Amino acid sequence: MKTRKKKRALAVSPLALVLPATSANLGPAFDAAALAFGLFLKVQAVAANEFSITASGRDPEICGRVENHLILTTYREVLQAEGKAAQPLVLHIENDIPIGKGCGSSAAARLAGIALAVHFGRLRWTDSRIVGEASRREHHPDNAAACWMGGLAVARMSGESEAQVACIIPKGKWPLLLAVPEEALPTEQARRVLPKEYSRADAVTNVQNSMLLLAAFVQGRRDLLVSALEDRMHQPYRAALCPLLPALQKLAGASGVLGAVLSGAGPSVLIFLDANAKDGNGKGGKAGVDRAAAKVRGHLRACGLRAELISTAITNRGAGQGKSWAKRRS
């Protein structure tokens, strides 16, 4: 008589995630849109007997602690809600996203935790549910949608944990410069300065500019961006908290700078450079963009303002399109 062999539980394979930074609001598209750009939170996870983390890059003292870690907290909470035990993990984190500076660091961390829970907990979650859960935890869907899907994300909440999302691949080249001040700005503080009511004129202007902004990205119309970035709903009220913004907005339409907006609620500022800018010898391409970036650096020095300037660009690949995640879904 043959005896049945017990099936061994299949070990869950390691997972690697690459989550881009995101910039929400983009001037007039307040609480409605976000853009993914090329700074990344990279997470490698392997099943283990106990939790441990190694971290490199920006803010390793925050990214490398196990206690109160946003990725691990989210991971545990999602699995607990699903009635599953949290498999201990060894994480290696490589972080390039400024933390607490309006660049979507919390959305990236929460999405990482959710993705780890889905993978190691063997949850059958769709992209929509992953983005919805991250949006519920973030209290708005723009950063989460752009981080997971890439490109330009237009999003709204349609329930407590349901997000309606449309993603657009911007046409053409969109070089960016990110100005990051030394001090962080809590989102709660940036929210407190906003008015409770707006005039019809201001609301209409923002709707018009949001439509122009969308058209600029869809059609690759850089010429529309200078006027399309005007906002009347949040940036005028936050300018006192983010002195980089009014200084950099003065460059809009000149010196190869298309415009500047708060990244999220600030204090970082996202600067759109003209991909067709020319250098002093009439050369375009990288030379022209580099000259525009140098103009920004010189302007900040002349204004007596200090900030780290990071050259980057829009990225159309979100965490949900990464090789490791795509492989596990195939």
Kindly label every feature range from the protein language model:
Residues 47, 157, 181, 271-275:
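Short beta-strand-to-loop capping motifs
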Residues 180-240:
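Active-site rim beta-loop-alpha module in soluble metabolic enzymes
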